Amino acid sequence: MPPEQPELSVVIVTGDPGTRRGLEKTLSSLLHQRSVEKIEIVVVDCASADAPPLSGSDHPRVRTVKLPRSGTTMAQARAEGVRQARAPIVGFLDEHSFAMAGWAEALIKAHQGPWAGVGGEIYNGTSARGFSDPIYLMGHSRWMPPAPRGEAELLPSHDTCYKREVILQYGDQLPELLMAEPVLMRRLRLDGHRLYVDPDVKSIHGYTVNPLTLVAFYAWSRCFAASRARSLGWSLGKRLLFGLSSPLIPLVRAARLFQYLLLRRPVCLPTFLIGLPIILLAQAGAAVGEGLGMIFGLGGAEVLFTQTHLRGLRLRAEYP
């Protein structure tokens, strides 16, 4: 363990051996940061006891925390990573996110401000592969380069860094809030905290689109809806209203994305129009998840989402 106090902790969660290749590249992107001596990397390992260690985890800036394979969800693993972290700010990256040059330095600098959470620009690491470009627009269009610098209502999930003491105040609620980070961000803002986009914080995100990807969209969206309703104290009537309105989600979100691109990113409109069928299909999976999550709660969605990330359920593209 490094003797000096780190300025930034980065939590990455790893699962079964077949899912580790992308995370090894994620870890490498952190170990090649200019400010690596200021970083602590917390690898939360949720694989079986006989699984080989993540390549690169023997680096002096890396600390491994073992959790049981059985019964540990992605959100629980991330929350434990936050608790184990030693730096005042803690960020997350997953197996399809990679830090670009200067990422850590920019986060440390930005967090000198009054921000509870800081996010940055997201680049598409699988551009022109299959339907990755329309999915990129759907998920990260507002953080595409050049991302506007300034206070924000929402930051990119899985690529955001928080002040540790702020999110630890949520105690036993933290795992639930980390199931779907937009819920955590909404809760932070309701509690008077502020979020910030710094375009100097640059990361690459990979996108895979295949039938199993729809499973991940469904599972994450059900987690989002259930966590949103429960954490924000929604009444049964409000949950039913949102749940019964969920079939409108694909059209409403596609229309909002079209309007945003028309006004802010018109160069992306051809990609949107070509990819509209896959966007609607992905949002249909999300609509099913949100509708069920609002009305019936979490169900097995958190376990299913964990399987897509840690147990090899979702097929992954090869990233550069």
Language model segments and positions:
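N-proximal low-complexity "stem/linker" segments adjacent to membrane-targeting elements
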Residues: 1-29
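Short, acidic, metal-binding catalytic loop of nucleotide-sugar glycosyltransferases
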Residues: 28-38
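Glycine-rich, basic loop-to-helix element that forms the pyrophosphate-binding segment
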Residues: 68-85
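Short aromatic/hydrophobic "clamp" motif used to bind/position activated sugar donors
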Residues: 90
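Conserved donor NDP-sugar-binding/catalytic core segment of glycosyltransferases
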Residues: 102-131
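A recurrent flexible, glycine/aromatic-enriched loop bordering the glycosyltransferase active site
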Residues: 124, 143-162, 176-177, 203
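Acidic donor-binding loop at a coil-to-helix junction in glycosyltransferase catalytic cores
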Residues: 177-186
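Active-site-adjacent helix/loop segment of glycosyltransferases
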Residues: 195, 202-282
